[in-house]
Amino acid sequence: MSTSPDVVSLFPHATILATHPPGQAPTYETLHPAITQLNANAASIPSNSGDGTLGHIVLTIGQASYQTISNGNVAYPPPVAPAPLIIPQGTSAAMIAELRRNHDDATAAFNKYNAVDAALKKQILDATDVTYITSLKDRTTGFARVTTRQLIEHLYNNYGRITVETLTDNEARMKQPWDVTTPIELLFEQIDDGQAYATAGGEPYTDRRWWVVCFFHVTPTGGNLGALLSPLVCVKPKPYW
């Protein structure tokens, strides 16, 4: 199926970052920024399914994660191709119109879902050397039956592993001194990125450990600035998905 130009034109990222440097295998550090852009693209295409606010992000994060972050923890079942429309004899004109409208809506939702997946898949294929995904490629159909989510899972499972050493480096990055002449949002991002990395590595921060990192930043500032920053920085984030 060809990629709908209307879908691609709505993406905030016309292309995504490369999932790895030239000649080097992907890592979590190189995969995460690219997949984050892919998530944003998926979420930008409206959908009435699920909770109706997250677009088609289910295509990149999967069903379980979608239900976790959706309003009301609702699921997003993938649309199925509707069967040919059959109109029983004796059906009223009004009911025929309703049946046709419902069938058209179901067909449009199915086609849109697959068009978005095709567009996202093309982006990740363009951003990744085939060497690292060749095990998913069929000799006859290529990647035609491979979904965007399957590509993402393959890359993370095979190349995005987080080690004890990289977790140690991550905490050091979280504790890098903040330049107080820059916006405080940069400090928030620094700590949030570290928390997300630790969670992805299977070592989410306990409350105690979180506060240790938090006060590492606010206590050296002292004075009124420290008092000002403390309630801002030391707010434990929501769980990451």
Protein language model regions, located:
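Short connector loops/turns at beta-strand edges and beta->alpha or beta->beta junctions
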Residues: 129-133
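Terminal peptide-recognition signature
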Residues: 124
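"Short basic amphipathic alpha-helical interaction patches in structured regions
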Residues: 136-143, 170-171
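Short coil/turn segments at secondary-structure boundaries
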Residues: 137-139, 227-230
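Plant-biased recognition of short, low-complexity, intrinsically disordered N-terminal tails
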Residues: 1-22
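Long, low-complexity intrinsically disordered regions in eukaryotic proteins
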Residues: 64-66
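Amphipathic alpha-helical oligomerization segments
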Residues: 20-50, 69-81, 87-105, 113-116, ...
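Fungal eukaryote-biased detector of long internal structured cores
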Residues: 152-159, 170-177, 233-241
